[in-house]
Regions:
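Active-site proximal helix-loop segment of RNase H-like, two-metal nucleases, encompassing DDE(D)
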Residues: 298-302, 306-329
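C-terminal domain-tail junction helix/linker
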Residues: 323-382
């Protein structure tokens, strides 16, 4: 019978003459082999290249990796033949070197919905902006110096006193920033735009409590707006997948659509896209990899401009994080990142477009930075 449409044998005929290795179905046109591998194994998954059963190789809390162990697999032979002479010598010295990954692998993820939540500022803060003794204008001034100008809390305190005669402690500045971020975050998540056909993703470094952490961004290539963001302590699959969910929404909501994600060589993006597309009739997100600073292939040449967008976004983000010389808590880093995204999308005029990536009607005609923050806080609280 036909492997694809299950048509009886009388509808199959030899398609390669005397070799008698290939049959063609008259009903659906499917090409099959006369001696196909019968899947009598009780294995959970099979190799798509050689049809041999996949063996469970590694298991972690988030995923199980299955591996094709066959040395006759076409995928393995193709990867092996592509090795350079130097790589072949090194591999003979260490056959099980994990850097080559010649055998086909499949990952089964065990992620729960709570694992796919992006990190956001804590809802409970030390102050309630509706009950503070200072005016909202002072809060707007604090956010202008702290976010727009990228100054530290202590320098913000000093400038408020030296220029306007406003006496605040640096802790009060931090409290206002955290409270504003907690108030803006829900509004921001509800109004993040969905990426268009082409978007770029990247992760950048951030020091929190003297340890490396990572900020993830997804930016649309047309509007230049940030469509998704996240913070994590690893560059693993879970935060990458959570960022994709934050930007694109659930996979079921995108059935029948096609998106292209331009990213670097971080393997977490490949795994995250595979997990996102799992269970869908057709893949929703396909990736284009741009590595290094030079265009060494046609893909890099075509998609380099899109990758440059997220690189420039990271540079703008670093302008705001570098004066802090590291953050004392992940919640503080999340608060700063949330306010940066709000500033980048709604308040910062993009030099190439001569306007902000996203527009809010209530912000139109307001040129004063403190007043813009006051208005944005009022919109978020509504």
């Amino acid at each position: 019978r036909c492997e694809k449409c299950n048509a009886p044998a009388e509808y199959l005929y030899l398609n390669d003459g005397k070799k008698a290795n290939q049959v063609l179905c008259k009903i659906c046109g499917h090409l099959g082999t006369t001696e196909r591998v019968r899947r009598q194994s009780q294995a959970k998954y099979f190799c798509p290249h050689c049809s041999k059963p996949l063996s469970q190789w590694k298991t972690s809390s988030t995923e199980t990796i299955y591996k094709c162990m066959s040395n006759d697999c076409p995928h393995y032979l193709k990867k092996k033949s592509a090795l350079t002479p130097e790589e072949q010598v090194k591999r003979k010295q260490q056959k099980f070197d994990p850097n080559y990954k010649l055998h086909y692998q499949y990952r089964e993820y065990h992620l729960k919905p709570e694992d796919l939540k992006c990190h956001r500022p804590a809802c409970k803060t030390k102050v309630d902006l509706s009950k503070i003794h200072n005016s909202y204008h002072i809060v707007g001034l604090v956010l202008t110096f702290f976010v727009n100008a990228g100054l530290s809390s202590r320098l913000t305190r000093d400038l408020l006193k030296g220029i306007f005669g406003i006496k605040l402690s640096h802790q009060t500045v931090i409290n206002y920033v955290n409270a504003a971020a907690a108030q803006i975050a829900p509004f921001l998540d509800c109004n993040l735009p969905k990426p268009g056909k082409i978007a770029a993703a990247d992760e950048t470094y951030l020091i929190v409590e003297n340890e490396w952490h990572y900020t993830w961004f997804v930016i649309d290539s047309v509007t230049k707006a940030i469509c998704g963001y996240n913070l994590s302590d690893t560059r693993g699959v879970a935060p990458a997948l959570a960022t994709l969910y934050n930007a694109y929404g659930t996979p079921d909501s995108n059935k029948g659509k096609q998106f292209t994600l331009v990213r670097d060589g971080c393997p977490s993006y490949d795994s995250a896209m595979m997990a996102y597309n799992h269970g869908l009739p057709e893949p929703v997100i396909s990736g284009q990899k741009v590595i290094g600073l030079e265009n060494l292939d046609e893909v890099s040449k075509e998609y380099r401009p899109h990758k440059q967008l997220v690189e420039r976004l990271n540079r703008s983000y670093k302008f705001h994080t570098r004066p802090r010389a590291g953050m004392k808590s992940l919640n503080g880093a999340s608060a700063l990142t949330t306010l940066f995204v709000a500033y980048y999308n709604y308040l910062r005029v993009h030099s190439g477009m001569k306007h902000t990536p996203l527009k809010l009607e209530k912000l139109q005609g307001i040129s004063s930075y403190p007043k813009q923050w006051e208005t944005l806080l009022a919109i978020s609280a509504a």
